[in-house]
């Protein structure tokens, strides 16, 4: 109780009150524009008519914001293409998009202040390479060997938009800013219904990427706050009345009242929460919850998560979104790999004096393989091959130079091998490599109006082989990447690199 109250007071002391006036500062929108230019995923403030960002537009926007009828006009006429001032010719969508980018910058300020290091706290050294996606796999390899069950969770989404605003009220107590946020959400969807229309959420996500990511991360932060706190501190999870705790406001007061009714529950911590063999990993809207225990124990956690979303976030999620499987008998899709923990036979020769005998035992092994069907599907969607994996030419690239064609094919091939270097079976990668090499040859042959055989005889297959196996020297945290993948190599050696920070490099070049 004291720990939670202390956390709540510390959490409350960092709430921000006066955020709205920053929206009237021109430099805020300049920050938003510079962020879009320097971001790894460039987000340019562009309207549907390709009207780009300028300080003059921002000044006119701020003038309109000071006018009392600006918000009324947008709310009363959300479907009109133009505002009342037809001479200016600005679209209402463009104004809303600029505002959303500036609003996202402003509301991120309180959360950025929380990340500032405290002078009294010991500074934790930061290693850039620890951001690597591959750094999680050695952790899974060490821990999952001792676990029994795994729950693959599809985090419910989308949710009711009003809940997103209510979640921000715990961090930002600025009424005008929250009203402005409601205006954005009301502009892109029907306010009186659940946002089940994927068309409206797609438009909002596409035109307001920064704001959308901020709202979604706030929702995940609040959800994981309860998940982590209750797992560590509470002992009343199995009770049916635990739904009374799932309200953020006056949380400690309700726990204190419940502790009077059931004083014995708060004097001890049961193994249900404090079992050290429980691990939670979240990635790309999904999560993995692995633990050691019985099937009944893991089913409790499954229904706890369902009730958490139902009572606190006020929406119902289907139980089928949480798949509970036994690790030894199933595999799971994780970060582009099909992972499993099978029990492999192991023969051990034991020598005792003059007698020797063999001991046949079964040891669990963390196995990672490449999902060949999914990757061939990506290649087929990008028109490198057919659905069955037969290589074809890419006509859209025939207008490029020979070097550009080779560079694009080579980059995709190296990305595939670099990201999936942790696979325990490399033969699948060699098949994908063959598809890309032959597709590249057919594209070049089509450009020069020749056959593949004639083209390969003229250039030679050694040139393509050398091109696709060439890799840049990448320095990682532990070692230097020097291994080159070729057809004559180890088929079982797994290598995890510490320079991979995004999974999008695997799929997006194919689109």
Swiss-Prot record:
Keyword Nucleotide-binding on entry: no
Gene Ontology CC: chloroplast
Statement: the UniProt record of this protein carries the keyword tRNA processing: yes
GO BP terms in the entry: mRNA processing; RNA splicing; tRNA processing
Subcellular localization(s) per the UniProt record: Plastid, Chloroplast
Name of a matching Pfam family: MatK_N
One example GO MF annotation: RNA binding
UniProt entry keywords in alphabetical sequence: Chloroplast, mRNA processing, Plastid, RNA-binding, tRNA processing
Superkingdom of source: Eukaryota
Record family assignment: Belongs to the intron maturase 2 family. MatK subfamily.
Entry function: Usually encoded in the trnK tRNA gene intron. Probably assists in splicing its own and other chloroplast group II introns.
Name under which the protein is recorded: Maturase K
Record gene name: matK
């Amino acid at each position: 109780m004291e720990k939670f109250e202390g956390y709540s007071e510390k959490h409350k002391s960092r709430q921000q009150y006066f955020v709205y006036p920053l929206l009237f500062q021109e430099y805020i929108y300049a920050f938003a524009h510079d962020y879009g230019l320097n971001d790894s995923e460039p987000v340019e403030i562009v309207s549907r008519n390709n009207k780009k960002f300028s300080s003059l537009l921002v000044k006119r926007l701020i003038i309109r914001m000071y006018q009392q009828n600006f918000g009324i006009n947008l709310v009363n006429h959300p479907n009109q293409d133009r505002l009342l001032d037809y001479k200016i010719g600005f679209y209402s969508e463009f104004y809303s998009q600029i505002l959303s980018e500036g609003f996202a910058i402003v509301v991120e300020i309180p959360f950025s202040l929380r990340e500032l290091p405290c002078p009294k706290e010991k500074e934790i050294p930061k290693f850039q390479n620890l951001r690597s996606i591959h750094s999680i796999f050695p952790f899974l390899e060490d821990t999952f060997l001792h676990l029994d069950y795994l729950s693959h969770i599809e985090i419910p989404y989308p949710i009711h938009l009003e809940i997103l605003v209510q979640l921000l009220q715990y961090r930002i107590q600025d009424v005008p800013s929250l009203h402005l946020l409601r205006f954005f959400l009301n502009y892109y969807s029907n306010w009186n219904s659940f946002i089940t229309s994927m068309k409206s959420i797609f438009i909002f996500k596409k035109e307001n990427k920064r704001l959308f990511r901020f709202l979604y991360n706030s929702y995940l932060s609040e959800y994981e706050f309860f998940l982590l706190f209750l797992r560590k501190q509470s002992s009343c999870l199995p009770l049916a009345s635990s739904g009374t705790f799932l309200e953020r406001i006056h949380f400690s007061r309700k726990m204190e009242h419940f502790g009077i009714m059931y004083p014995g529950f708060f004097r001890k911590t049961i193994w249900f929460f404090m079992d050290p063999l429980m691990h939670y990993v979240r990635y790309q809207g999904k999560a993995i919850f692995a633990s050691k225990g019985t099937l009944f124990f893991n089913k409790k956690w499954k229904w706890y998560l369902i009730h958490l979303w139902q009572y606190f976030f006020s929406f119902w999620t289907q139980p089928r979104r949480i798949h509970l499987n036994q690790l030894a008998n199933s595999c799971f899709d994780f970060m582009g790999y099909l992972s499993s923990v099978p029990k492999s036979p192991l023969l051990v020769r034991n020598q005792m004096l003059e007698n020797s005998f063999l001991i046949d035992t079964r040891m669990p092994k963390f196995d990672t393989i490449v999902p060949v069907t999914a990757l061939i599907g990506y290649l087929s969607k990008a028109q490198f091959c057919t659905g069955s994996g037969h290589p074809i030419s890419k006509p859209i690239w025939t207008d490029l130079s020979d070097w550009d064609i080779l560079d694009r094919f080579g980059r995709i091939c190296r990305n595939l091998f670099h990201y999936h270097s942790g696979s325990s079976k490399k033969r699948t990668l060699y098949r994908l490599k063959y598809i890309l090499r032959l597709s590249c040859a057919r594209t070049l042959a089509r450009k020069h109006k020749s056959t593949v055989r004639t083209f390969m005889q003229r250039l030679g297959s050694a040139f393509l082989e050398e091109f696709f196996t060439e890799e840049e020297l990448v320095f990682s945290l532990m070692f230097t990447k020097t291994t080159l993948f070729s057809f004559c190599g180890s088929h079982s050696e797994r290598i995890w690199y510490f320079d991979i920070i995004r999974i999008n490099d695997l799929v997006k070049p194919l689109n």
